[in-house]
């Protein structure tokens, strides 16, 4: 998909394609459509990030709360989004043994209790051995810095999902903006 | 459900229950959870409305763009949310004859083209005869005032959905705020 195609989309198509760039937050894609045309992947991505950065703290926490636990209830029940299912699978989180899964559930619960949002991590940049270590480490962080870290992970996930959709075309098919 | 119960919910439960108060915008419910405890339905509702009002214009348009057309593609394909299905059914929009449905589709398309968001109306406060008349009327409005009208309809829908969930209990079970 190239940017000429992206810039020609009506809002219905745009939300169909980009609605889950930020997990379960089609509102953000639907808002970003207002900023078209986009000059390339980076420009499009920057509009997603600017929207996130401009939200009040409750809204930023709200974004995090729309994310599933890693190796959590949604994975067990088969109710993950397609994107999250693929990402957790690539990190090996869909094939944990019972002990590792219970250990992660316990850490996830502690994290949710401490910060009021779930542990968010770009799973594709991690693996089954690293996830619980990183979770245990971030559990010790201060709430203010942890919110920033978690939003940084949301942006990494968004970048990877946008790259999946736009791939190499996004750089080669830059369009002239008016 | 009374407010004691609502105020005791963790964010996962809260988003499960209130995630579609604003159509397909669980981000808003997830943000509102930060404002607990709530003294009653009106207080809870005001936090939803305050979040909507504080969004930049693109975000407000984004909320509208997460709504389906009335008697549109999602209804035909069976992909409406449960709440929207019920509301459109109560307004008689699920049993239109072909001529009426095509007329509405045509008006919806004109409206989306003119304003850049879909026609949003609290269907439960309307009926199959009124919907196309109101759509044709609002199609003539100025974009600025039409955005305000449409967000007012989002709030009416949210109010009705909250009342469905909280009903009479919400007034009788007020809790003391700290």
UniProtKB/Swiss-Prot annotation, chains A, B:
InterPro entries: OHCU_decarboxylase, OHCU_decarboxylase-1, OHCU_decarboxylase_sf
Keyword Lyase (UniProt): yes
The entry's keywords: Decarboxylase, Lyase, Peroxisome, Purine metabolism
GO BP annotation list: adenosine catabolic process; allantoin metabolic process; amide catabolic process; AMP catabolic process; dAMP catabolic process; deoxyadenosine catabolic process; deoxyguanosine catabolic process; deoxyinosine catabolic process
A family per Pfam: OHCU_decarbox
E.C. no: 4.1.1.97
Molecular-function GO terms, alphabetical: 2-oxo-4-hydroxy-4-carboxy-5-ureidoimidazoline decarboxylase activity; carboxy-lyase activity
Location in the cell: Peroxisome
Associated pathway: Purine metabolism; urate degradation; (S)-allantoin from urate: step 3/3
Annotated residues for binding of substrate: 68, 84-88, 119-123
Active site: 67 (proton donor)
A cellular component term, taken from the record's GO annotations: peroxisome
EC primary class: lyase
Reactions accelerated catalytically: 5-hydroxy-2-oxo-4-ureido-2,5-dihydro-1H-imidazole-5-carboxylate + H(+) = (S)-allantoin + CO2
Lineage: superkingdom: Eukaryota
Predominant cellular place of this UniProt entry's protein: other
Keyword Lyase: yes
Protein family: Belongs to the OHCU decarboxylase family.
Function according to Swiss-Prot or TrEMBL: Catalyzes the stereoselective decarboxylation of 2-oxo-4-hydroxy-4-carboxy-5-ureidoimidazoline (OHCU) to (S)-allantoin.
PANTHER family per record: 2-OXO-4-HYDROXY-4-CARBOXY-5-UREIDOIMIDAZOLINE DECARBOXYLASE-RELATED (PTHR43466:SF1)
Name used for this protein in its record: 2-oxo-4-hydroxy-4-carboxy-5-ureidoimidazoline decarboxylase
